[in-house]
Every structure is written in C-alpha cells, then in structure tokens.
Amino acid sequence: MSSTLLIVVIVVVTALAFDFTNGFHDSANAMATSVATGALKPKVAVIIAAVLNVIGACLSTEVAKTISGGIVNDHLVTAPMVFAGLIGAIIWNLATWLFGLPSSSSHALFGGLIGAVLVEAGMSGIDAGKIMSKIILPALVAPFVAGIASLLATWLAY
C-alpha cells in the first residue's frame, strides 16, 4: 500500500470517527428533552435519532458546501491538514460531551480545519471575509433572530 493511499484511508477512518462523535454529541442534544419529559423512551429516541442522522447526512450538504466554498484555500489543503482538523474537532466534541457543554460539531469541524490551515499555511490559507460572513456572523446573529421570531410567535399566539 502506497503512503498516499494509507494517508487517505487514515483520513477516511478519522472522518468516520468524527461522524460518530457528531452523532452521539448532537443527537443527545436533540433528544434529551423528549426523553426527560417521558415523551419518548430512550430506545425509541436512539432509533429516531439514528434514522434522522442518516437521512440528514444523505440530504444535507450545506456543511460540505461551506467548507469547500472558499473559507480555506483549497490548493493549500493537504490530507494531513484534514486529518489534523478532524482530530481537533473530535477532541473538542469529546471534551464538551465529557463536561456537558453544548457545542456544535459543525463549528468544531470548521475550527479544526481553519486552525490546521492557519498553522500550516498562515493567513494566506484562509479567507477571513468568508469566515466572517459564512460562520461568525451567522453564529452571532442567529440567537437574536430566533429571539425576535419567538417573541413575535408568542405575541401572535396570546
């Protein structure tokens, strides 16, 4: 087996490990309320979460589009950088899960990849404007938009 093929296999296995941590990390966040209130039994919640994660992975490509949409310079990204980014995201997912902290696996993946590219290629490896417009600004604006939407929905309902 050539060294390039070995690196690709290692990156793919690491991506599957990230996907596993993404599943148990984010699924727990999504299903906790249903299980805690008794609306769903834990086994049913796990089955629903698994099925919906598979469907979501098949139907949604927005995270992949964002990553490939120019936030990092594609020509500078190498398999070891992707591996380092995945390892960083896995460690972050496990740490936040261990301490019971809410976090986004997608943002962990963005952070891991951006960090790996910064270390290897420096500022020339990233597009700060796209990072601001595609990741940071939406993360800052979304809570306010959700708050206003919920306020309006509450006013309309009562």
Q: Where do the protein language model's features map onto the residues?
A:
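Alpha-helical transmembrane segments and immediately membrane-proximal extracytoplasmic
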Residues: 1-158
